[in-house]
């Protein structure tokens, strides 16, 4: 996570670790399926999204980049368009260059 955080700082796309609370894991359980990806409550979407993804990445290092919030901006930076920002692309490229 530290390498990803540093990459984000280098390209002005900040990220940080968020906990996945056990309650959010429980909300991914379904009465009619193994899992569900939405609990009909519009709060904590990033954390609940990570709780859902966690079921598919057992035993590997992973990160959930929730880009919904920064995907569009009203006051774009010099490298952003006023439409979609592409948030996360620069971060991942910097991380891979490592």
Predicted regions and their residues:
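A generic structural signal for tightly packed, nonpolar segments enriched in small/aliphatic residues
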Residues: 1-98
């Amino acid at each position: 996570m530290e390498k990803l955080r540093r990459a984000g700082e280098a390209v002005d796309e900040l990220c940080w670790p968020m906990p996945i609370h056990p309650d959010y894991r429980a909300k991914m359980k379904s009465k009619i399926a193994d899992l569900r990806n939405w609990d009909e409550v519009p709060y904590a979407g990033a954390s609940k999204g990570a709780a859902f993804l966690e079921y598919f990445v057992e035993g590997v290092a992973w990160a959930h980049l929730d880009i919904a919030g920064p995907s569009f901006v009203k006051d774009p930076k010099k490298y952003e368009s006023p439409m979609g920002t592409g948030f996360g692309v620069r971060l991942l490229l910097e991380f891979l260059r490592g």
